[in-house]
From Swiss-Prot:
Disulfide bonds: none annotated. NCBIfam families: DegV. The keyword Nuclease does not apply. The keyword NAD does not apply. It comes from Thermotoga maritima (strain ATCC 43589 / DSM 3109 / JCM 10099 / NBRC 100826 / MSB8). It comes from the Bacteria. May bind long-chain fatty acids, such as palmitate, and may play a role in lipid transport or fatty acid metabolism. This is DegV domain-containing protein TM_1608. GO terms for molecular function: lipid binding. Residues 1-211 form the DegV domain.
Length: 212
């Protein structure tokens, strides 16, 4: 990453914004803090801002959109912008098997084995940059219904849908259909990148809204 930043500086850029996934879920934010601290000494005329979105995937994308808008408007209080954006984001996602979460250490082995055995699936959220289990439901139908229920929020909003394996795409399209009458002004459907899917496994799907 240092080489990438040096290349950007060599092109004449004097303000660099590095926007990252939650520092509580990824080490990359702290790595970039170290890199930019070193570069500040060599390039004192360049301003670096390393920003923790306190989100992942779709949520991080929504924070990034708000940051871009705020920078164009001349705002400097970007940490406050992140806070404001997070207050307007609601994320819900689930996994249909625990194997990958167990391997990554995010779920205890005994919990994961029991979940796989009796088909109990967690519904998770991102709160203050951390994963939180907000509910547990048995069976896919109940998981989908709970996610839809939680995302029915008053007001205009953007809807983001995310899935890992191709077989999960049908599920997020079902969620989209169930939310179509909820004042949705924009829909984004994205596939989870391998860097995140390696933790969740292919049977992950979710949705999130950003209140406008």
């Amino acid at each position: 990453m240092e080489r990438v930043l040096r290349d950007i500086i060599s092109e004449g850029c004097t303000r660099i914004y590095c926007v990252h996934l939650s520092s509580k879920l990824s080490a990359f934010y702290n790595v970039m803090k170290s890199v930019t601290e070193r570069l500040k000494e060599k390039f004192p005329s360049v301003t670096f801002r390393v920003i923790d979105t306190r989100q992942v995937s779709i949520g991080a994308g929504y924070v990034l959109l708000k940051l871009m808008e705020s920078v164009k408007d001349g705002r400097e209080d970007l940490e406050r912008v992140v806070q404001e954006a997070n207050e307007r984001i609601k994320i819900r996602f689930s996994v249909l098997e625990f194997d990958y979460l167990m391997k990554s250490g995010r779920v205890k082995a005994i919990t994961g084995m029991l979940g796989n055995l009796i088909k109990i699936h967690p519904i998770l959220s991102i709160e203050d940059g951390e994963l939180r289990v907000v509910a547990k439901k048995r069976g896919l139908k109940n998981v989908v219904e709970k996610i839809v229920q939680d995302l029915k929020i008053d007001g205009r909003k953007m809807l983001g849908l995310v899935y890992a394996g191709e077989e999960m795409k049908e599920i997020v399209l079902e969620i989209e259909e169930k939310l179509k009458d909820e004042h949705i002004e924009r829909v984004d459907i994205v596939r989870l990148p391998p860097t995140l899917a390696v933790h969740s496994g292919p049977k992950m799907f979710g949705a999130g809204v950003f209140i406008l």
